[in-house]
Amino acid sequence: MSLRNWFSQLDKEHQSSIDYKKYKPIWADIRTSNYCNLQCNMCSQADSSQIQSFVKKNTHMSKYFRQVAAGNNLDINIDIDFSNLKFLKLAGGEPTIDPYCIAFLDKFIKKYDASKVELIITTNATRIKNFFDKYKSKFKSLTVILSIDAVDEVYNLIRFPANWNTVKHNVDQLCTMKEININLNFVIQPYNILVADQWLHFISKFVKDRPKTKIDFLNCINPKHFSIDAMPDSAKQFVTDMLKTSEKNFPNIRKKISELQTIVTNSSYKQDYHAILVDHLHDISKIRNIDYIKTIPEFKYLL
């Protein structure tokens, strides 16, 4: 369970005994709903309404997603005084298109002085223009955390039904807004680590253009079949060799590449995780009518 989920559950259990009007937070981490336009393989029904819909139509696929309670993490109506707020963090779902999130922001701006608040938003960057055109001038500063995970065909697989070319165009447009801080998130899993050299090239160029960019590599541990533990030793050896080459090719992000090497080194092969991973690859290929093993040659190391 994520920290945000844990606090939401705690709220539900103790809501009646807490007088929220006494508190004036300076930091708020808000997730209004699971409304989302993607069905990323490492997410859950609680994270994405698209996954909810997908699982309803393909019930046999539910076993591959992270097993948490379906629905919204936050379904409470609390009267909180945000007058002292300095940092507002928004996540989803996809907050840039979530009508609940937009309604919350509109209400917040109307009631409080948003020019004193730093807005931090995590987004998949699929539909961001209207959101940032509307809100970027309202807040003291804006930090955008881009959930990327990969590029090209592997991006399209992991973050289905998003298209990398469209997202890359949106990110390029976002980068022209120098007043916006941009950070990158990558959830490390077998599908993307096998082509790490491709997205490390993207990161290397990105950091050259925006040196203050923060890069976060989040090691996927749930679902377990999307952890690096699901990779056979031959696949990990391929990745290890590739990362050594990447260190030479992208010296400006050598420390970040070292983090990936540590993730691979610290993993321990689990045959049962591997079997489920391969089953997922075959099942998702069949459902989408895309032979990912042929489309992405590096996936042969997973078989």
Residue map of PLM features:
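Alpha-helix termini
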Residues: 76-79, 108-114, 134-137, 175-177, ...
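Distinct, well-ordered alpha-helical segments
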Residues: 102-106, 129-136, 195-199
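Short amphipathic alpha-helical surface micro-motifs
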Residues: 8-13, 70-72, 104, 127-129
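Core AdoMet radical
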Residues: 23-35, 46-72, 83-99, 111-130, ...
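N-terminal pre-core extensions flanking Radical SAM catalytic domains
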Residues: 1-68, 80-82, 253-303
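Conserved C-terminal portion of the radical SAM core fold
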Residues: 120, 140-145, 165-302
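Non-transmembrane alpha-helical segments in soluble domains
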Residues: 40, 102-109, 172, 200-204
